[in-house]
Amino acid sequence: MALLQISEPGMSAAPHRHRLAAGIDLGTTNSLVATVRSGSAACLPDADGRVTLPSVVRYLENGGIEVGKTALSAQKTDPLNTVSSAKRLIGRTLADLHQNTHYLPYRFGDNQRFIELHTRQGVKTPVEVSAEILKTLKLRAEETLGGDLVGVVITVPAYFDDAQRQATKDAARLAGLNVLRLLNEPTAAAIAYGLDNASEGTFVVYDLGGGTFDVSVLQLTKGLFEVKATGGNSALGGDDFDHRLFCYLLEQNRLSQLNEQDSQLLLSLVRAAKEQLTTQTEARIQATLSDGMAIDTSISRAEFHNLTQHLVMKTLEPVKQALKDAGVGKNEVKGVVMVGGSTRMPHVQQAVATFFGQTPLNNLNPDEVVALGAAIQANVLAGNKADGEWLLLDVTPLSLGLETYGGLAEKIIPRNSTIPTARAQDFTTFKDGQTAMTIHVVQGERELVSDCRSLAKFTLRGIPPMAAGAARIRVTFQIDADGLLSVSAQEQSTGVQAQIEVKPSYGLDDDTITQMLKDSMGNAAEDMAARARAEAVVEAESLTDAVNAALELDSDLLDAEEFAQIQRDIADLQGRLKDGKAEDIRAAVAKLSRSTDNFAAKRMNRNIQRALTGQSVDNI
Protein backbone atom coordinates (compact mmCIF):
# COMPACT_ATOMS: atom_id res chain seq x y z
CA MET A 1 0.00 0.00 0.00
CA ALA A 2 1.52 3.30 -1.07
CA LEU A 3 1.92 6.19 1.32
CA LEU A 4 -1.01 8.57 1.18
CA GLN A 5 0.07 12.08 0.22
CA ILE A 6 -1.86 15.28 0.85
CA SER A 7 -0.31 18.49 -0.44
CA GLU A 8 -0.48 21.81 1.31
CA PRO A 9 -3.48 23.96 0.26
CA GLY A 10 -2.69 25.98 -2.84
CA MET A 11 0.33 23.87 -3.72
CA SER A 12 0.49 21.58 -6.74
CA ALA A 13 2.77 18.58 -6.41
CA ALA A 14 3.05 17.94 -10.12
CA PRO A 15 3.23 20.44 -12.98
CA HIS A 16 0.85 18.44 -15.16
CA ARG A 17 -1.88 18.90 -12.54
CA HIS A 18 -1.54 22.66 -12.45
CA ARG A 19 -3.72 23.98 -15.27
CA LEU A 20 -2.47 27.34 -16.44
CA ALA A 21 -4.72 29.17 -18.89
CA ALA A 22 -4.70 32.66 -20.36
CA GLY A 23 -6.83 35.07 -22.33
CA ILE A 24 -5.29 36.81 -25.33
CA ASP A 25 -6.53 39.97 -26.99
CA LEU A 26 -4.89 39.79 -30.42
CA GLY A 27 -5.34 43.41 -31.41
CA THR A 28 -4.70 45.50 -34.49
CA THR A 29 -2.52 48.06 -32.70
CA ASN A 30 -1.67 46.34 -29.41
CA SER A 31 -2.05 42.84 -28.02
CA LEU A 32 -2.33 41.67 -24.41
CA VAL A 33 -2.33 38.47 -22.39
CA ALA A 34 -4.15 38.07 -19.08
CA THR A 35 -4.80 35.32 -16.57
CA VAL A 36 -6.76 34.71 -13.39
CA ARG A 37 -4.67 34.61 -10.24
CA SER A 38 -5.97 34.57 -6.68
CA GLY A 39 -9.50 34.80 -8.03
CA SER A 40 -9.13 37.95 -10.12
CA ALA A 41 -8.12 38.59 -13.71
CA ALA A 42 -5.05 40.69 -14.46
CA CYS A 43 -3.02 41.53 -17.54
CA LEU A 44 0.55 40.25 -17.48
CA PRO A 45 3.34 42.81 -17.98
CA ASP A 46 6.64 42.38 -19.77
CA ALA A 47 10.04 42.82 -18.11
CA ASP A 48 9.64 46.60 -18.33
CA GLY A 49 6.21 46.61 -16.71
CA ARG A 50 4.20 47.23 -19.91
CA VAL A 51 1.06 45.14 -20.37
CA THR A 52 0.47 46.14 -24.00
CA LEU A 53 2.55 44.59 -26.77
CA PRO A 54 2.58 46.61 -30.00
CA SER A 55 1.24 44.30 -32.72
CA VAL A 56 4.29 44.89 -34.90
CA VAL A 57 6.72 42.31 -36.30
CA ARG A 58 10.07 43.05 -37.98
CA TYR A 59 12.07 40.57 -40.05
CA LEU A 60 15.84 41.06 -39.67
CA GLU A 61 18.69 40.43 -42.13
CA ASN A 62 20.28 37.77 -39.92
CA GLY A 63 17.10 35.70 -39.89
CA GLY A 64 15.98 37.00 -36.52
CA ILE A 65 12.57 38.44 -35.69
CA GLU A 66 11.65 41.39 -33.49
CA VAL A 67 8.19 41.73 -31.99
CA GLY A 68 6.64 44.64 -30.13
CA LYS A 69 8.26 47.90 -29.10
CA THR A 70 11.63 47.25 -30.73
CA ALA A 71 9.92 46.44 -34.02
CA LEU A 72 7.70 49.51 -33.70
CA SER A 73 10.71 51.78 -33.24
CA ALA A 74 12.17 50.53 -36.54
CA GLN A 75 8.96 51.00 -38.52
CA LYS A 76 9.96 54.40 -39.88
CA THR A 77 13.37 53.29 -41.15
CA ASP A 78 12.57 49.73 -42.27
CA PRO A 79 8.93 49.81 -43.43
CA LEU A 80 9.09 46.99 -45.98
CA ASN A 81 10.22 44.46 -43.39
CA THR A 82 8.14 45.75 -40.47
CA VAL A 83 4.52 44.62 -40.47
CA SER A 84 1.80 46.21 -38.35
CA SER A 85 -2.01 45.94 -38.32
CA ALA A 86 -1.85 42.33 -39.53
CA LYS A 87 -5.28 41.84 -38.01
CA ARG A 88 -6.74 43.94 -40.83
CA LEU A 89 -5.18 41.56 -43.35
CA ILE A 90 -5.73 38.17 -41.75
CA GLY A 91 -8.15 35.91 -43.57
CA ARG A 92 -8.55 38.43 -46.38
CA THR A 93 -7.66 38.72 -50.05
CA LEU A 94 -6.31 41.64 -52.05
CA ALA A 95 -9.81 42.14 -53.44
CA ASP A 96 -11.11 42.60 -49.88
CA LEU A 97 -8.74 45.53 -49.33
CA HIS A 98 -10.21 47.40 -52.32
CA GLN A 99 -8.42 50.70 -52.83
CA ASN A 100 -6.73 50.84 -49.43
CA THR A 101 -3.44 49.18 -50.42
CA HIS A 102 -1.87 52.37 -51.75
CA TYR A 103 -1.20 53.87 -48.32
CA LEU A 104 0.02 50.62 -46.77
CA PRO A 105 3.83 50.57 -47.01
CA TYR A 106 4.13 46.92 -48.00
CA ARG A 107 5.09 45.00 -51.13
CA PHE A 108 2.03 42.85 -51.76
CA GLY A 109 2.24 39.67 -53.78
CA ASP A 110 -0.22 39.11 -56.59
CA ASN A 111 -1.75 35.97 -55.08
CA GLN A 112 -5.52 36.29 -55.42
CA ARG A 113 -6.39 33.67 -52.78
CA PHE A 114 -4.66 35.29 -49.85
CA ILE A 115 -2.44 38.22 -48.97
CA GLU A 116 1.31 37.88 -49.35
CA LEU A 117 3.85 40.34 -47.96
CA HIS A 118 7.35 40.34 -49.42
CA THR A 119 10.09 40.80 -46.81
CA ARG A 120 13.85 40.24 -46.70
CA GLN A 121 13.07 36.82 -45.21
CA GLY A 122 10.81 35.92 -48.11
CA VAL A 123 7.05 35.89 -48.45
CA LYS A 124 5.11 36.17 -45.19
CA THR A 125 1.37 35.89 -44.64
CA PRO A 126 -0.72 37.73 -42.02
CA VAL A 127 -1.19 34.35 -40.32
CA GLU A 128 2.58 34.00 -39.85
CA VAL A 129 2.90 37.59 -38.65
CA SER A 130 0.11 37.07 -36.11
CA ALA A 131 1.75 33.82 -34.97
CA GLU A 132 4.92 35.73 -34.00
CA ILE A 133 2.83 38.06 -31.82
CA LEU A 134 1.09 35.10 -30.20
CA LYS A 135 4.43 33.36 -29.57
CA THR A 136 5.69 36.44 -27.71
CA LEU A 137 2.56 36.59 -25.55
CA LYS A 138 2.77 32.84 -24.89
CA LEU A 139 6.38 33.19 -23.72
CA ARG A 140 5.47 36.14 -21.49
CA ALA A 141 2.65 34.19 -19.86
CA GLU A 142 4.64 31.01 -19.32
CA GLU A 143 7.63 32.85 -17.89
CA THR A 144 5.39 34.86 -15.55
CA LEU A 145 3.30 31.89 -14.43
CA GLY A 146 6.19 29.45 -14.27
CA GLY A 147 4.70 26.69 -16.39
CA ASP A 148 3.20 25.69 -19.72
CA LEU A 149 -0.21 26.96 -20.76
CA VAL A 150 -2.81 24.22 -21.17
CA GLY A 151 -4.84 26.49 -23.40
CA VAL A 152 -5.91 30.00 -24.28
CA VAL A 153 -9.02 31.91 -25.20
CA ILE A 154 -8.32 34.30 -28.08
CA THR A 155 -10.69 37.15 -28.76
CA VAL A 156 -11.84 38.11 -32.24
CA PRO A 157 -14.14 40.84 -33.51
CA ALA A 158 -17.75 39.69 -33.45
CA TYR A 159 -17.99 40.56 -37.12
CA PHE A 160 -15.04 38.38 -38.15
CA ASP A 161 -16.23 35.94 -40.79
CA ASP A 162 -15.39 32.25 -41.01
CA ALA A 163 -12.20 32.86 -42.98
CA GLN A 164 -10.85 35.37 -40.46
CA ARG A 165 -11.70 33.10 -37.53
CA GLN A 166 -10.04 30.07 -39.10
CA ALA A 167 -6.96 32.15 -39.96
CA THR A 168 -6.74 33.27 -36.32
CA LYS A 169 -6.84 29.64 -35.14
CA ASP A 170 -4.15 28.74 -37.66
CA ALA A 171 -1.93 31.52 -36.30
CA ALA A 172 -2.41 30.08 -32.81
CA ARG A 173 -1.44 26.62 -34.07
CA LEU A 174 1.76 28.03 -35.53
CA ALA A 175 2.48 29.66 -32.18
CA GLY A 176 2.09 26.33 -30.39
CA LEU A 177 -1.08 27.35 -28.57
CA ASN A 178 -4.07 25.17 -27.75
CA VAL A 179 -7.15 27.30 -28.45
CA LEU A 180 -9.87 26.56 -25.91
CA ARG A 181 -12.25 29.02 -27.53
CA LEU A 182 -12.46 31.93 -29.92
CA LEU A 183 -14.46 34.54 -28.03
CA ASN A 184 -16.14 37.59 -29.53
CA GLU A 185 -14.52 40.75 -28.19
CA PRO A 186 -17.73 42.49 -27.04
CA THR A 187 -18.75 39.33 -25.20
CA ALA A 188 -15.36 39.22 -23.48
CA ALA A 189 -15.86 42.81 -22.36
CA ALA A 190 -19.30 41.94 -21.02
CA ILE A 191 -17.86 39.06 -19.03
CA ALA A 192 -15.30 41.38 -17.45
CA TYR A 193 -17.90 44.01 -16.59
CA GLY A 194 -20.63 41.60 -15.59
CA LEU A 195 -18.53 39.52 -13.24
CA ASP A 196 -16.72 42.48 -11.74
CA ASN A 197 -19.82 44.56 -11.14
CA ALA A 198 -22.60 41.95 -10.87
CA SER A 199 -24.54 44.07 -13.37
CA GLU A 200 -27.99 43.13 -14.61
CA GLY A 201 -30.05 44.54 -17.46
CA THR A 202 -29.55 45.36 -21.14
CA PHE A 203 -26.10 46.60 -22.07
CA VAL A 204 -24.49 47.70 -25.31
CA VAL A 205 -20.81 47.02 -25.92
CA TYR A 206 -19.30 49.58 -28.30
CA ASP A 207 -15.91 48.27 -29.39
CA LEU A 208 -13.80 50.50 -31.63
CA GLY A 209 -10.30 49.09 -31.97
CA GLY A 210 -7.39 49.79 -34.24
CA GLY A 211 -8.81 48.01 -37.26
CA THR A 212 -12.28 46.75 -36.44
CA PHE A 213 -15.60 47.93 -35.03
CA ASP A 214 -18.08 45.74 -33.18
CA VAL A 215 -21.30 46.37 -31.35
CA SER A 216 -23.23 43.86 -29.29
CA VAL A 217 -26.48 44.08 -27.39
CA LEU A 218 -26.39 41.87 -24.31
CA GLN A 219 -28.88 40.86 -21.68
CA LEU A 220 -27.09 40.36 -18.38
CA THR A 221 -28.97 38.59 -15.63
CA LYS A 222 -27.66 36.73 -12.64
CA GLY A 223 -25.41 34.04 -14.05
CA LEU A 224 -26.44 34.53 -17.68
CA PHE A 225 -24.69 36.46 -20.46
CA GLU A 226 -26.96 36.37 -23.49
CA VAL A 227 -25.92 38.14 -26.67
CA LYS A 228 -29.17 39.35 -28.23
CA ALA A 229 -27.68 40.87 -31.39
CA THR A 230 -24.36 41.86 -32.85
CA GLY A 231 -23.09 43.94 -35.73
CA GLY A 232 -20.14 45.95 -36.88
CA ASN A 233 -17.55 46.45 -39.56
CA SER A 234 -14.38 44.35 -39.64
CA ALA A 235 -12.65 47.00 -41.76
CA LEU A 236 -13.32 50.12 -39.68
CA GLY A 237 -11.14 51.24 -36.80
CA GLY A 238 -8.51 53.63 -35.54
CA ASP A 239 -6.37 52.99 -38.62
CA ASP A 240 -9.07 54.67 -40.73
CA PHE A 241 -8.83 57.80 -38.58
CA ASP A 242 -5.06 57.70 -39.15
CA HIS A 243 -5.59 57.31 -42.89
CA ARG A 244 -7.93 60.30 -43.05
CA LEU A 245 -5.42 62.49 -41.21
CA PHE A 246 -2.66 61.11 -43.44
CA CYS A 247 -4.61 62.15 -46.56
CA TYR A 248 -5.24 65.59 -45.04
CA LEU A 249 -1.51 65.99 -44.48
CA LEU A 250 -0.81 65.10 -48.12
CA GLU A 251 -3.44 67.57 -49.30
CA GLN A 252 -2.09 70.39 -47.14
CA ASN A 253 1.43 69.86 -48.45
CA ARG A 254 0.43 69.15 -52.09
CA LEU A 255 1.92 65.66 -52.01
CA SER A 256 0.77 62.73 -54.12
CA GLN A 257 2.98 59.65 -54.30
CA LEU A 258 5.39 58.82 -51.46
CA ASN A 259 7.93 56.03 -51.14
CA GLU A 260 7.43 53.38 -48.47
CA GLN A 261 9.78 55.00 -45.96
CA ASP A 262 8.12 58.42 -46.19
CA SER A 263 4.65 56.86 -46.00
CA GLN A 264 5.57 54.97 -42.84
CA LEU A 265 7.16 58.08 -41.34
CA LEU A 266 4.05 60.20 -41.89
CA LEU A 267 1.71 57.43 -40.76
CA SER A 268 3.54 57.13 -37.45
CA LEU A 269 3.45 60.91 -37.00
CA VAL A 270 -0.27 61.26 -37.73
CA ARG A 271 -0.98 58.39 -35.34
CA ALA A 272 0.95 60.22 -32.63
CA ALA A 273 -0.93 63.43 -33.46
CA LYS A 274 -4.27 61.64 -33.17
CA GLU A 275 -3.33 60.34 -29.73
CA GLN A 276 -2.10 63.79 -28.71
CA LEU A 277 -5.45 65.34 -29.69
CA THR A 278 -7.16 63.03 -27.21
CA THR A 279 -5.80 65.12 -24.36
CA GLN A 280 -4.73 68.36 -26.07
CA THR A 281 -6.51 70.85 -28.31
CA GLU A 282 -3.78 71.07 -30.95
CA ALA A 283 -1.05 68.87 -32.41
CA ARG A 284 1.89 69.70 -34.66
CA ILE A 285 3.32 67.35 -37.30
CA GLN A 286 6.93 68.00 -38.32
CA ALA A 287 9.06 65.84 -40.59
CA THR A 288 11.74 65.91 -43.26
CA LEU A 289 11.09 63.58 -46.18
CA SER A 290 13.73 61.55 -47.98
CA ASP A 291 13.92 64.16 -50.78
CA GLY A 292 14.61 66.92 -48.24
CA MET A 293 11.12 68.41 -48.22
CA ALA A 294 10.13 69.77 -44.82
CA ILE A 295 6.66 69.12 -43.39
CA ASP A 296 5.32 71.41 -40.67
CA THR A 297 1.55 71.23 -40.22
CA SER A 298 -0.62 72.00 -37.22
CA ILE A 299 -4.10 70.60 -36.69
CA SER A 300 -6.63 71.45 -34.00
CA ARG A 301 -8.89 68.99 -32.25
CA ALA A 302 -11.90 70.63 -33.91
CA GLU A 303 -10.35 70.20 -37.37
CA PHE A 304 -9.56 66.56 -36.67
CA HIS A 305 -13.11 66.00 -35.48
CA ASN A 306 -14.51 67.53 -38.67
CA LEU A 307 -12.21 65.38 -40.80
CA THR A 308 -13.25 62.15 -39.13
CA GLN A 309 -16.80 62.76 -37.92
CA HIS A 310 -18.15 60.71 -40.85
CA LEU A 311 -16.23 57.71 -39.52
CA VAL A 312 -17.77 58.16 -36.09
CA MET A 313 -21.25 58.38 -37.61
CA LYS A 314 -20.46 55.28 -39.65
CA THR A 315 -20.14 53.32 -36.40
CA LEU A 316 -23.64 54.34 -35.30
CA GLU A 317 -25.37 52.61 -38.22
CA PRO A 318 -24.49 49.09 -36.97
CA VAL A 319 -25.50 50.25 -33.48
CA LYS A 320 -28.99 51.16 -34.72
CA GLN A 321 -29.30 47.87 -36.59
CA ALA A 322 -28.18 45.81 -33.59
CA LEU A 323 -30.74 47.53 -31.35
CA LYS A 324 -33.43 46.86 -33.95
CA ASP A 325 -32.41 43.20 -34.26
CA ALA A 326 -32.52 42.81 -30.48
CA GLY A 327 -35.90 44.53 -30.23
CA VAL A 328 -34.49 47.06 -27.78
CA GLY A 329 -35.00 50.81 -27.66
CA LYS A 330 -32.25 53.26 -26.73
CA ASN A 331 -34.10 54.17 -23.57
CA GLU A 332 -34.03 50.53 -22.42
CA VAL A 333 -30.23 50.35 -22.41
CA LYS A 334 -28.91 50.38 -18.86
CA GLY A 335 -25.31 51.04 -19.79
CA VAL A 336 -22.89 51.41 -22.68
CA VAL A 337 -19.52 49.73 -22.29
CA MET A 338 -16.70 51.37 -24.23
CA VAL A 339 -13.99 49.00 -25.45
CA GLY A 340 -10.89 49.58 -27.56
CA GLY A 341 -8.24 52.27 -27.52
CA SER A 342 -10.00 54.28 -30.24
CA THR A 343 -12.89 55.01 -27.87
CA ARG A 344 -10.57 57.42 -26.08
CA MET A 345 -11.13 59.98 -28.85
CA PRO A 346 -13.37 62.72 -27.38
CA HIS A 347 -15.72 62.98 -30.37
CA VAL A 348 -16.31 59.22 -30.26
CA GLN A 349 -17.29 59.41 -26.59
CA GLN A 350 -19.47 62.44 -27.27
CA ALA A 351 -21.27 60.82 -30.20
CA VAL A 352 -22.04 57.69 -28.18
CA ALA A 353 -23.18 59.72 -25.17
CA THR A 354 -25.46 61.85 -27.35
CA PHE A 355 -26.93 58.84 -29.16
CA PHE A 356 -27.80 56.94 -25.97
CA GLY A 357 -28.48 59.95 -23.77
CA GLN A 358 -26.11 58.72 -21.06
CA THR A 359 -22.45 58.78 -20.16
CA PRO A 360 -20.73 55.57 -21.29
CA LEU A 361 -19.14 53.25 -18.73
CA ASN A 362 -15.37 53.50 -18.53
CA ASN A 363 -14.43 52.16 -15.09
CA LEU A 364 -12.33 49.42 -16.72
CA ASN A 365 -9.34 50.22 -18.92
CA PRO A 366 -10.67 49.99 -22.52
CA ASP A 367 -7.33 48.57 -23.66
CA GLU A 368 -7.43 45.75 -21.09
CA VAL A 369 -11.09 44.84 -20.64
CA VAL A 370 -11.24 42.36 -23.55
CA ALA A 371 -8.17 40.45 -22.38
CA LEU A 372 -9.55 40.34 -18.83
CA GLY A 373 -12.82 38.82 -20.01
CA ALA A 374 -10.93 36.28 -22.11
CA ALA A 375 -8.85 35.31 -19.08
CA ILE A 376 -11.98 34.70 -17.01
CA GLN A 377 -13.43 32.48 -19.73
CA ALA A 378 -10.11 30.63 -20.14
CA ASN A 379 -10.02 29.95 -16.42
CA VAL A 380 -13.43 28.30 -16.64
CA LEU A 381 -12.67 26.27 -19.76
CA ALA A 382 -9.39 25.03 -18.28
CA GLY A 383 -11.35 23.50 -15.43
CA ASN A 384 -10.04 25.79 -12.71
CA LYS A 385 -13.50 27.09 -11.90
CA ALA A 386 -16.90 25.51 -12.26
CA ASP A 387 -18.87 27.09 -15.07
CA GLY A 388 -22.15 26.47 -13.28
CA GLU A 389 -21.93 29.95 -11.81
CA TRP A 390 -22.62 31.62 -15.15
CA LEU A 391 -23.66 30.75 -18.67
CA LEU A 392 -22.44 32.40 -21.85
CA LEU A 393 -24.71 32.48 -24.91
CA ASP A 394 -23.00 34.02 -27.94
CA VAL A 395 -24.32 34.49 -31.46
CA THR A 396 -23.17 34.21 -35.06
CA PRO A 397 -22.87 37.65 -36.69
CA LEU A 398 -23.71 36.77 -40.30
CA SER A 399 -26.22 34.45 -41.94
CA LEU A 400 -24.96 31.17 -43.37
CA GLY A 401 -26.58 29.39 -46.27
CA LEU A 402 -26.07 27.79 -49.65
CA GLU A 403 -26.58 28.49 -53.31
CA THR A 404 -29.79 27.31 -54.96
CA TYR A 405 -30.76 27.28 -58.63
CA GLY A 406 -30.54 30.70 -60.20
CA GLY A 407 -27.68 31.93 -58.04
CA LEU A 408 -29.93 32.59 -55.05
CA ALA A 409 -28.65 32.42 -51.47
CA GLU A 410 -30.86 30.30 -49.23
CA LYS A 411 -30.21 31.10 -45.56
CA ILE A 412 -29.92 28.07 -43.28
CA ILE A 413 -28.67 29.74 -40.09
CA PRO A 414 -29.86 33.35 -39.73
CA ARG A 415 -27.56 35.94 -38.22
CA ASN A 416 -27.75 36.46 -34.46
CA SER A 417 -28.47 32.75 -33.93
CA THR A 418 -27.17 31.54 -30.57
CA ILE A 419 -24.12 29.30 -30.92
CA PRO A 420 -23.23 26.49 -30.84
CA THR A 421 -26.12 25.50 -33.09
CA ALA A 422 -27.20 23.12 -35.85
CA ARG A 423 -29.87 23.62 -38.50
CA ALA A 424 -31.06 21.32 -41.30
CA GLN A 425 -33.12 21.88 -44.42
CA ASP A 426 -34.25 19.60 -47.25
CA PHE A 427 -33.44 20.28 -50.90
CA THR A 428 -34.12 18.41 -54.13
CA THR A 429 -32.71 17.90 -57.61
CA PHE A 430 -33.37 20.22 -60.55
CA LYS A 431 -33.00 17.79 -63.47
CA ASP A 432 -34.32 14.31 -64.25
CA GLY A 433 -31.75 11.62 -63.52
CA GLN A 434 -29.49 13.99 -61.57
CA THR A 435 -27.00 11.87 -59.60
CA ALA A 436 -24.80 14.54 -58.02
CA MET A 437 -25.26 17.89 -56.34
CA THR A 438 -22.72 20.61 -55.65
CA ILE A 439 -23.19 22.29 -52.27
CA HIS A 440 -21.92 25.89 -52.35
CA VAL A 441 -21.71 27.35 -48.82
CA VAL A 442 -21.98 31.14 -48.53
CA GLN A 443 -22.04 33.76 -45.79
CA GLY A 444 -23.87 37.07 -45.86
CA GLU A 445 -27.20 38.84 -45.81
CA ARG A 446 -27.72 39.46 -49.53
CA GLU A 447 -30.15 37.51 -51.67
CA LEU A 448 -27.74 36.73 -54.50
CA VAL A 449 -24.75 34.43 -54.11
CA SER A 450 -22.63 36.89 -56.08
CA ASP A 451 -23.16 39.44 -53.29
CA CYS A 452 -22.23 37.01 -50.50
CA ARG A 453 -18.88 35.60 -49.43
CA SER A 454 -18.09 32.14 -50.75
CA LEU A 455 -16.85 29.84 -47.99
CA ALA A 456 -16.60 26.38 -49.51
CA LYS A 457 -17.90 23.92 -52.10
CA PHE A 458 -18.29 20.16 -51.99
CA THR A 459 -20.14 17.55 -54.04
CA LEU A 460 -22.66 14.91 -52.96
CA ARG A 461 -22.48 11.96 -55.36
CA GLY A 462 -24.48 8.75 -55.58
CA ILE A 463 -27.97 10.26 -55.67
CA PRO A 464 -30.32 7.63 -57.20
CA PRO A 465 -31.57 8.68 -60.66
CA MET A 466 -35.06 10.06 -60.19
CA ALA A 467 -37.42 12.55 -61.70
CA ALA A 468 -36.55 16.15 -60.95
CA GLY A 469 -37.85 17.11 -57.53
CA ALA A 470 -38.21 13.52 -56.29
CA ALA A 471 -34.93 13.16 -54.41
CA ARG A 472 -34.66 14.50 -50.88
CA ILE A 473 -31.26 15.81 -49.77
CA ARG A 474 -30.97 17.01 -46.19
CA VAL A 475 -28.27 19.63 -45.70
CA THR A 476 -27.15 20.24 -42.11
CA PHE A 477 -25.14 23.25 -40.94
CA GLN A 478 -23.31 23.06 -37.60
CA ILE A 479 -21.51 25.94 -35.89
CA ASP A 480 -19.26 25.21 -32.93
CA ALA A 481 -18.59 27.48 -29.97
CA ASP A 482 -15.75 29.18 -31.87
CA GLY A 483 -18.15 30.19 -34.64
CA LEU A 484 -16.57 27.74 -37.10
CA LEU A 485 -18.78 25.88 -39.54
CA SER A 486 -19.17 22.31 -40.80
CA VAL A 487 -21.74 21.25 -43.40
CA SER A 488 -23.08 17.81 -44.34
CA ALA A 489 -25.49 16.62 -47.04
CA GLN A 490 -27.35 13.30 -47.02
CA GLU A 491 -29.69 11.72 -49.58
CA GLN A 492 -32.57 10.40 -47.49
CA SER A 493 -33.51 7.20 -49.35
CA THR A 494 -30.00 5.70 -49.65
CA GLY A 495 -28.23 7.39 -46.76
CA VAL A 496 -25.32 8.40 -49.02
CA GLN A 497 -23.56 11.33 -47.38
CA ALA A 498 -20.88 13.96 -47.95
CA GLN A 499 -19.58 16.55 -45.53
CA ILE A 500 -16.98 19.26 -45.16
CA GLU A 501 -15.38 21.17 -42.34
CA VAL A 502 -15.37 24.63 -43.82
CA LYS A 503 -11.79 25.83 -44.14
CA PRO A 504 -12.01 28.90 -46.33
CA SER A 505 -9.46 29.30 -49.09
CA TYR A 506 -7.89 32.39 -47.56
CA GLY A 507 -4.54 30.79 -48.03
CA LEU A 508 -2.80 28.24 -45.87
CA ASP A 509 -3.72 24.61 -46.49
CA ASP A 510 -3.12 21.88 -43.91
CA ASP A 511 0.13 20.74 -45.55
CA THR A 512 1.53 24.25 -45.44
CA ILE A 513 0.53 24.72 -41.82
CA THR A 514 1.94 21.32 -40.91
CA GLN A 515 5.25 22.20 -42.54
CA MET A 516 5.33 25.53 -40.71
CA LEU A 517 4.68 23.73 -37.46
CA LYS A 518 7.54 21.34 -38.18
CA ASP A 519 9.81 24.25 -39.02
CA SER A 520 8.94 26.11 -35.83
CA MET A 521 8.98 23.10 -33.52
CA GLY A 522 12.38 21.59 -34.17
CA ASN A 523 12.93 21.16 -30.45
CA ALA A 524 9.50 19.75 -29.64
CA ALA A 525 10.81 16.23 -28.87
CA GLU A 526 13.49 17.57 -26.56
CA ASP A 527 10.94 19.82 -24.86
CA MET A 528 8.57 16.90 -24.26
CA ALA A 529 11.39 14.79 -22.84
CA ALA A 530 12.45 17.62 -20.55
CA ARG A 531 8.87 18.08 -19.36
CA ALA A 532 8.45 14.36 -18.70
CA ARG A 533 11.65 14.35 -16.65
CA ALA A 534 10.54 17.43 -14.70
CA GLU A 535 7.26 15.74 -13.83
CA ALA A 536 9.09 12.59 -12.74
CA VAL A 537 11.47 14.63 -10.56
CA VAL A 538 8.56 16.39 -8.84
CA GLU A 539 6.86 13.05 -8.19
CA ALA A 540 10.12 11.59 -6.83
CA GLU A 541 10.83 14.51 -4.53
CA SER A 542 7.28 14.47 -3.21
CA LEU A 543 7.50 10.75 -2.39
CA THR A 544 10.96 11.08 -0.83
CA ASP A 545 9.83 13.93 1.43
CA ALA A 546 6.78 11.95 2.54
CA VAL A 547 8.83 8.82 3.31
CA ASN A 548 11.48 10.74 5.27
CA ALA A 549 8.79 12.51 7.30
CA ALA A 550 7.16 9.15 8.07
CA LEU A 551 10.50 7.63 9.14
CA GLU A 552 11.08 10.45 11.59
CA LEU A 553 7.77 9.71 13.28
CA ASP A 554 7.37 5.95 13.07
CA SER A 555 10.67 4.27 12.17
CA ASP A 556 10.28 2.06 15.27
CA LEU A 557 7.65 0.10 13.33
CA LEU A 558 10.35 -1.27 11.02
CA ASP A 559 12.87 -3.99 11.64
CA ALA A 560 16.50 -3.39 10.70
CA GLU A 561 16.25 -5.00 7.26
CA GLU A 562 13.07 -3.10 6.31
CA PHE A 563 14.61 0.19 7.41
CA ALA A 564 17.82 -0.51 5.48
CA GLN A 565 15.91 -1.44 2.31
CA ILE A 566 13.92 1.79 2.39
CA GLN A 567 17.11 3.80 2.91
CA ARG A 568 18.77 2.03 -0.04
CA ASP A 569 15.76 2.76 -2.27
CA ILE A 570 15.75 6.43 -1.22
CA ALA A 571 19.46 6.71 -2.02
CA ASP A 572 18.93 5.00 -5.38
CA LEU A 573 16.11 7.40 -6.24
CA GLN A 574 18.08 10.48 -5.22
CA GLY A 575 21.02 9.29 -7.29
CA ARG A 576 18.85 9.08 -10.39
CA LEU A 577 17.53 12.61 -9.89
CA LYS A 578 20.89 14.06 -10.92
CA ASP A 579 21.10 12.85 -14.51
CA GLY A 580 18.66 9.97 -14.89
CA LYS A 581 16.03 9.81 -17.61
CA ALA A 582 12.33 10.12 -16.86
CA GLU A 583 11.71 6.38 -17.16
CA ASP A 584 14.64 5.61 -14.80
CA ILE A 585 13.30 8.01 -12.20
CA ARG A 586 9.79 6.58 -12.48
CA ALA A 587 11.16 3.05 -12.05
CA ALA A 588 12.96 4.12 -8.87
CA VAL A 589 9.77 5.81 -7.62
CA ALA A 590 7.81 2.60 -8.17
CA LYS A 591 10.49 0.58 -6.34
CA LEU A 592 10.46 2.91 -3.31
CA SER A 593 6.67 2.88 -3.28
CA ARG A 594 6.63 -0.93 -3.18
CA SER A 595 9.21 -1.12 -0.39
CA THR A 596 7.12 1.24 1.77
CA ASP A 597 3.78 -0.53 1.28
CA ASN A 598 4.13 -2.56 4.49
CA PHE A 599 5.36 0.50 6.40
CA ALA A 600 2.30 2.48 5.27
CA ALA A 601 -0.02 -0.28 6.45
CA LYS A 602 1.68 -0.42 9.87
CA ARG A 603 1.41 3.37 10.23
CA MET A 604 -2.28 3.30 9.39
CA ASN A 605 -2.91 0.57 11.98
CA ARG A 606 -1.04 2.57 14.63
CA ASN A 607 -3.02 5.71 13.87
CA ILE A 608 -6.30 3.78 14.07
CA GLN A 609 -5.28 2.31 17.44
CA ARG A 610 -4.37 5.77 18.73
CA ALA A 611 -7.69 7.13 17.60
CA LEU A 612 -9.61 4.34 19.34
CA THR A 613 -7.63 4.37 22.60
CA GLY A 614 -9.88 5.36 25.51
CA GLN A 615 -13.05 5.26 23.39
CA SER A 616 -16.07 3.19 24.38
CA VAL A 617 -18.09 1.25 21.85
CA ASP A 618 -20.94 3.77 22.19
CA ASN A 619 -18.65 6.64 21.17
CA ILE A 620 -17.36 4.94 18.03
From Swiss-Prot:
Key words of the record: ATP-binding, Chaperone, Nucleotide-binding
Matches recorded under CDD domains: ASKHA_NBD_HSP70_HscA
Coiled coil: none
Pfam hit, one: HSP70
GO terms for MF: ATP binding; ATP hydrolysis activity; ATP-dependent protein folding chaperone; unfolded protein binding
InterPro entries the UniProt entry points to: ATPase_NBD, Heat_shock_70_CS, HscA_NBD, HSP70_C_sf, HSP70_peptide-bd_sf, Hsp_70_fam, ISC_FeS_clus_asmbl_HscA
GO biological-process terms attached to the record: iron-sulfur cluster assembly
Free-text function comment from the UniProt entry: Chaperone involved in the maturation of iron-sulfur cluster-containing proteins. Has a low intrinsic ATPase activity which is markedly stimulated by HscB.
Family: Belongs to the heat shock protein 70 family.
The protein, known as: Chaperone protein HscA homolog
Organism: Neisseria gonorrhoeae (strain ATCC 700825 / FA 1090)
Taxonomy of the source species: Bacteria, Pseudomonadati, Pseudomonadota, Betaproteobacteria, Neisseriales
